[in-house]
UniProtKB/Swiss-Prot annotation:
Main localization of the protein described in the UniProt heading: secreted
Region named Lipoprotein lipase cofactor: 78-101
Gene Ontology CC terms, in alphabetical order: chylomicron; high-density lipoprotein particle; low-density lipoprotein particle; very-low-density lipoprotein particle
Molecular function terms, GO-annotated: phospholipase activator activity; phospholipase binding
Stretches for region Lipid binding: 66-74
Species this protein is from: Phoca vitulina (Harbor seal)
Gene Ontology terms: biological process: lipid catabolic process; lipid transport; positive regulation of phospholipid catabolic process
Function: Component of chylomicrons, very low-density lipoproteins (VLDL), low-density lipoproteins (LDL), and high-density lipoproteins (HDL) in plasma. Plays an important role in lipoprotein metabolism as an activator of lipoprotein lipase. Both proapolipoprotein C-II and apolipoprotein C-II can activate lipoprotein lipase.
The family this protein is said to belong to: Belongs to the apolipoprotein C2 family.
PTM per Swiss-Prot/TrEMBL: Proapolipoprotein C-II is synthesized as a sialic acid containing glycoprotein which is subsequently desialylated prior to its proteolytic processing.
Name of the featured protein: Apolipoprotein C-II
Highest taxon of source: Eukaryota
Annotated localization: Secreted
Length: 101
């Protein structure tokens, strides 16, 4: 999944870079471009809202309280274990870096 986010980030930066380096347009073209950008933005917000509503509806349909409790319990146990092992690793690393003093 990290590659997808990186690809999206690169594409967004590329588009923004091209926009910054683009030639200056006459005033009339800027107004047309602005309205096109506004339409595109409104369209994207509409799609985002639709996807968000569909995801919320799907979540509400499949919500199981027992599963939610199990997930919370697993999360709590795993974070406790990770924090314990991270503490042990940190102590070992610090003792290696300090050496015999």
């Amino acid at each position: 999944m990290g590659i997808r986010y990186l690809l999206v980030l690169v594409l967004v930066l590329l588009v923004l870079g091209c926009e910054v380096q683009g030639a200056h347009m006459p005033q009339q073209d800027e107004a047309t471009s602005s309205s096109l950008f506004t339409q595109l933005q409104e369209s994207l917000y509409g799609y985002w809202g639709t996807a968000k509503a569909a995801a919320q509806e799907l979540y509400e349909k499949t919500y199981l309280t027992t599963m939610d409790e199990k997930i919370r319990e697993i999360y709590n146990k795993s974070t406790a274990a990770v924090s314990t092992y991270a503490g042990i690793f940190t102590d070992q690393l610090l003792s290696m870096l300090k050496g015999d003093q």
